[in-house]
């Protein structure tokens, strides 16, 4: 058994078959997008069906962009989310207010670019359950681009550092079956998040790519475990 296990979040699912396949693959989490301009947006009625199909042991994440507490609460009236992901310009106070109102843990996404002070950002959002790092693009949502992983503070990457020295990192941004092993080897994230890397077209998931991505993560974890035990 590998000593390192990278959690897997498959994001932007829109179809029941996508969710069924994600569950069958053993994904730890799925992501549902509640940002209407996104091609991966799902209305609450469809989202409720998708969330129910995930079952009790898969985290159902709701992605919101600058939504109000009332907007999020209205979604929760119909959709059994278990985690919130704030992907806009929300302040720490706004995140805490919204999450407190609906009683759910939350992640804060950051679109990384040169000059971004990740340590300062992590300190501001210390109440989050994790920090999701994505590539910077104009507008909101993922653009399928990989950001420069050397921008991640080196103290967060040290395997000898205590867990309290770094936030739980959820690595996103242009990941695919072709590059996720390298990402895991370099960054050792708590989790990886993928959307465009498992699509045949924008908003259309591809089961073969989903399978290949999960397999690549598992193989990378196994390789890390073998290197630790050697």
Swiss-Prot record:
CDD domains referenced in this protein's UniProt entry, alphabetically: PRAI (cd00405)
Gene Ontology MF terms: phosphoribosylanthranilate isomerase activity
A Gene Ontology BP annotation from the UniProt entry: L-tryptophan biosynthetic process
Pfam families reported for this sequence: PRAI
Metabolic or biological pathway, per its Swiss-Prot or TrEMBL entry: Amino-acid biosynthesis; L-tryptophan biosynthesis; L-tryptophan from chorismate: step 3/5
UniProt entry keywords in alphabetical sequence: Amino-acid biosynthesis, Aromatic amino acid biosynthesis, Isomerase, Tryptophan biosynthesis
UniProt xrefs under InterPro entries: Aldolase_TIM (IPR013785), PRAI_dom (IPR001240), RibuloseP-bd_barrel (IPR011060), TrpF_fam (IPR044643)
EC numbers: 5.3.1.24
UniProt catalytic activity: N-(5-phospho-beta-D-ribosyl)anthranilate = 1-(2-carboxyphenylamino)-1-deoxy-D-ribulose 5-phosphate
Annotated transmembrane regions: none
Sequence similarity: Belongs to the TrpF family.
Protein's name in the database: N-(5'-phosphoribosyl)anthranilate isomerase
Chain's gene name: trpF
